[in-house]
Curated annotation (Swiss-Prot):
Any Pfam family the entry gives: ATP_bind_3
Keywords: ATP-binding, Cytoplasm, Ligase, Nucleotide-binding, tRNA processing
GO molecular function terms attached to this record: ATP binding; tRNA(Ile)-lysidine synthase activity
GO cellular component, one term: cytoplasm
Source organism of the structure: Escherichia coli O6:H1 (strain CFT073 / ATCC 700928 / UPEC)
Protein's recorded name: tRNA(Ile)-lysidine synthase
Top enzyme category: ligase
Record's subcellular location: Cytoplasm
Comment field on protein domains: The N-terminal region contains the highly conserved SGGXDS motif, predicted to be a P-loop motif involved in ATP binding.
GO terms under biological process: tRNA modification
Length: 437
C-alpha cells in the first residue's frame, strides 16, 4: 500500500497533519514523512488535540511528542475543553478538534486527516440512521474546503486492514484509545458490532457504501448547480434569506434552498422536521410575532421578512458594567466582545465627576441626534431597524445616569461633543455578532 497522492496534496507545500497517535494517523504521518524526504520543499507539521477525556491523555501527548521528535516533525499540542450544550461527547470532541485545527493552520497550509474506507462506511451508516438526504449520505469528501484552505483525506480509499499491514511492516508504534471499545458510542457500535457482520456477509460492503456516497455527492453537486440562481435571488448581501421569493416554490425546492443557505452559514444540516418548522413556525409566523427556532447553540429568526441565522446569546438587560479605567478596552459578558473609547468622533469625553458605565437598557424618553422629540428606547430600536435579538445585547454608554450613545447606532443630544475633541464608542464584536448584525 502507498499513499494516494491526489493533485491537491501534490501541489501543497505546507501541510498540517492531524495526529492523534492512533494507528490511522501514525501511518499517515509516516507516509508523509517519507514523501517529504523525496520532496525537500515540503513543510510538514503535526497537531495533537488533548481532549482531557481519558486518564491516559497526558501519556498520549508524550507518545506523540516522541514520535514527532524521532521523525523531525514540529508538533503543536492543543488542549481543549468540551462544554457545548446540546451535543453528545462524540460531537463535542469533534467540534473542539476542528476548532483547534482551524486556530493552528498557518497561511498557505492544508489540513490532512487520516480517515479511511472503514470510517467512510461508518459515516454513511450513521447518516442513514439519522434519515439524511443526499448531502448527509455523501459522507466525507477526499478534498473539501475548511477554514479558508483545504482539508485533504488521502487514505479514504484504504481499509483499516491495509493501514495495519503498513504499520506492522514498518515497525510503527501507536496508541490504543480505550474508549474505542465502548460500544455505547454510536460509531463504536457500528465498528464493533454491525460492520463486521455486514463485511462477513458481503466482503465488499465498505467499497459499495463508498460508491453510494460518491453518487450522492454527485447528485448534491448537480443540485447546487441547478439551484445556484434561486439561492442568489433569495439571499441578501448581508447573508440573510428573503422569504417572499420562496412563497411560490414547491416544498422540495424551498427546503433545498434553505438547506443550502444554512450550509453557507456553516450550520449543521437540519433534519426534515426542522426544515418544516423553520418554514411553518418562523417564516410564516404572524406579522407581529418575533419567532425563534433554536438549533443547538444557534437560532433561526425572522426579521423584516428575512430569515437570520444567529448565535444564541443571553440578554443582558440587567447588566451594569462600571468602566473606571475607560481609557482601556472593556470586556463584555456572554462573548459579546469588547468596547473602547477612541480618539476622534462626535461623542464628548466624560467629565472628571462622571462615572462611566456600560449598560444594556435605558429608561425614560431619550433624545437622539437626528430625531426630533423624545422616544423610548424600544421605539428608537424599531425606527433604526435594530433586530430584536440585538436590542438587549447592544452596549449603551452611560455617564452617571445619562445615556450618551449606543455603540454603532446613535448618539444622544446629551452626549454630543460641542467645541471640544470628541471620542468614538467602538464595539469590537465577535464573529457571530458581526454576522448577526
Amino acid at each position: 500500500m502507498t499513499l494516494t497522492l491526489n493533485r491537491q496534496l501534490l501541489s501543497s507545500r505546507q501541510i498540517l497533519v492531524a495526529f492523534s497517535g492512533g494507528l490511522d494517523s501514525t501511518v499517515l504521518l509516516h507516509q508523509l514523512v517519507q514523501w517529504r524526504t523525496e520532496n525537500p520543499g515540503v513543510t510538514l507539521r503535526a497537531i495533537h488535540v488533548h481532549h482531557g477525556l481519558s486518564a491516559n491523555a497526558d501519556a498520549w501527548v508524550k507518545h506523540c511528542e516522541n514520535i514527532c521528535q524521532q521523525w523531525q516533525v514540529p508538533l503543536v499540542v492543543e488542549r481543549v475543553q468540551l462544554a457545548q450544550e446540546g451535543l453528545g461527547i462524540e460531537a463535542q470532541a469533534r467540534q473542539a478538534r476542528y476548532q483547534a485545527f482551524a486556530r493552528t493552520l498557518l497561511p498557505g497550509e492544508v489540513l490532512v486527516t487520516a480517515q479511511h474506507l472503514d470510517d467512510q462506511c461508518e459515516t454513511f451508516l450513521l447518516a442513514l440512521k439519522r434519515g439524511s438526504g443526499p448531502a448527509g449520505l455523501s459522507a466525507m469528501a477526499e478534498v473539501s474546503e475548511f477554514a479558508g484552505t483545504q482539508l485533504i483525506r488521502p487514505l479514504l480509499a484504504r481499509t483499516r486492514g491495509e493501514l495495519e499491514q503498513w504499520a506492522l511492516a514498518h515497525g510503527l508504534r501507536w496508541i490504543e484509545d480505550e474508549s474505542n471499545q465502548d460500544d455505547s458510542y454510536d460509531r463504536n457500535f457500528l465498528r464493533l458490532r454491525v460492520v463486521p457482520l455486514l463485511q462477513q456477509r458481503w466482503p465488499h460492503f465498505a467499497e459499495a457504501t463508498a460508491r453510494s456516497a460518491a453518487l450522492c455527492a454527485e447528485q448534491e453537486s448537480l443540485l447546487d448547480e441547478l439551484l445556484a440562481d434561486d439561492l442568489a435571488h433569495c439571499q441578501t448581501p448581508q447573508g440573510t434569506l428573503q422569504i417572499a421569493p420562496m412563497l411560490a416554490m414547491s416544498d422540495a425546492r424551498r427546503a433545498a434552498i434553505i438547506r443550502r443557505w444554512l450550509a453557507g452559514q456553516n450550520a449543521p444540516m437540519p433534519s426534515r422536521d426542522a426544515l418544516v418548522r423553520i418554514w411553518q413556525e418562523v417564516a410564516l409566523a404572524r406579522e407581529d410575532a418575533s419567532p425563534c427556532l433554536r438549533l443547538g447553540a444557534f437560532e433561526i429568526r425572522r426579521y423584516q421578512s428575512q430569515l437570520w441565522w444567529i448565535k444564541s446569546v443571553a440578554g443582558q438587560s440587567e447588566t451594569i458594567l462600571p468602566w473606571q479605567t475607560w481609557l482601556q478596552p472593556l470586556e463584555l459578558p456572554a462573548g459579546l466582545g469588547s468596547v473602547q473609547l477612541t480618539a476622534g468622533g462626535d461623542i464628548r469625553p466624560p467629565r472628571a465627576d462622571e462615572a462611566v458605565s456600560v449598560r444594556f437598557k435605558a429608561p425614560g424618553l431619550l433624545h437622539i441626534v437626528g430625531r426630533n422629540g423624545g422616544r423610548k428606547l424600544k421605539k428608537i430600536w424599531q425606527e433604526l431597524g435594530v433586530p430584536p435579538w440585538l436590542r438587549d445585547t447592544t452596549p449603551l454608554l452611560f455617564y452617571g445616569e445619562t445615556l450618551i450613545a449606543a455603540a454603532g447606532v446613535f448618539v444622544t443630544q446629551e452626549g454630543v461633543a460641542v467645541g471640544e475633541n470628541g471620542v468614538s464608542f467602538v464595539w469590537q464584536k465577535t464573529l457571530s455578532q458581526v454576522k448577526a448584525g
